[in-house]
């Protein structure tokens, strides 16, 4: 931050962030509008208002991608339902490596997707959107100190005056939004450490909860379990090293985003569990109870009573027919 040149504006990163300029521009204006709104309500312009602006920005981004996430969940549910049919197609062409067989397998697979309105790439879209948004946020918050001291041109709503106001913001009077772990005072280091820990915990718990509650027993072999356990600890550890290098403003964004992702994962496992997982078994019981409650409210028989009535009816039918199996009528071919 003390360099006269903003390194993210040069080389490959400069080219990449130049492409993301529209996203960066939009982010600055959302933050500025939210900040001005809180100031209008009486919040200090150089205090918590900028922190709230960052948090609201995360919520706006999450609200924008939620419809895509919901569509992703529905697509994944369809993909899971198609798994047996996919397995049959793969078994049909198992061991066939010639070009014609591969093309035929690809055609049958695509037809299966089209007939069931499934897009296999749809599950990647929310992640593809969140990546550039986070990169743009990191760039914007890192560039603000350079805008404030005149070492960089204005970016969107952040001119020199606005950038200076932003850099004067601190949290609890302890840590500036532009501080990172190495530049902060001892008390600031403690606050940053707490934020990094919470970030790591949110990520760890999100993965742990998904692994324990949303993994089908049939898909869990020793290799998969080993890989899942490695990822459970690998990414939180990576967060530690990257988190201490980030400006505190980025940590606010990152922690808020992780909390939102954790809440979304909890809802996903509750509403769209993986078939065969413990969460799916709980959902089946829950749906069963809810259906019986709905039937009771409408004065209808419960699922158990309905099944018992059908079984009794079938038994009476068999008794009447003397357990004789009705032979199918053979159709004559037309000449």
From Swiss-Prot:
Keywords, in A-Z order: Cell membrane, Chaperone, Membrane, Protein transport, Transmembrane, Transmembrane helix, Transport
Annotated localization: Cell membrane
Membrane-crossing segments per the record: 46-66, 127-147, 191-211, 232-252
GO terms of molecular function: membrane insertase activity
InterPro entries hit by this protein: YidC/ALB3/OXA1/COX18 (IPR001708), YidC/Oxa/ALB_C (IPR028055), YidC_ALB_C (IPR047196)
A Pfam family it matches: 60KD_IMP
CDD domains linked: 5TM_YidC_Alb3
Superkingdom of the source species: Bacteria
Gene Ontology annotations for the cellular component aspect, listed alphabetically: plasma membrane
UniProt region (Disordered), positions on chain: 277-335
Membrane topology field: Multi-pass membrane protein
BP GO annotations: protein insertion into membrane; protein transport
Chain intervals with Basic and acidic residues compositional bias: 281-294, 307-319
Family recorded in the similarity comment: Belongs to the OXA1/ALB3/YidC family. Type 1 subfamily.
Assembly with partners or alone: Interacts with the Sec translocase complex via SecD. Specifically interacts with transmembrane segments of nascent integral membrane proteins during membrane integration.
Role noted for this protein: Required for the insertion and/or proper folding and/or complex formation of integral membrane proteins into the membrane. Involved in integration of membrane proteins that insert both dependently and independently of the Sec translocase complex, as well as at least some lipoproteins. Aids folding of multispanning membrane proteins.
Protein name as annotated: Membrane protein insertase YidC
Organism listed in the record: Bifidobacterium longum (strain NCC 2705)
Organism lineage: Bacteria, Bacillati, Actinomycetota, Actinomycetes, Bifidobacteriales
Gene: yidC
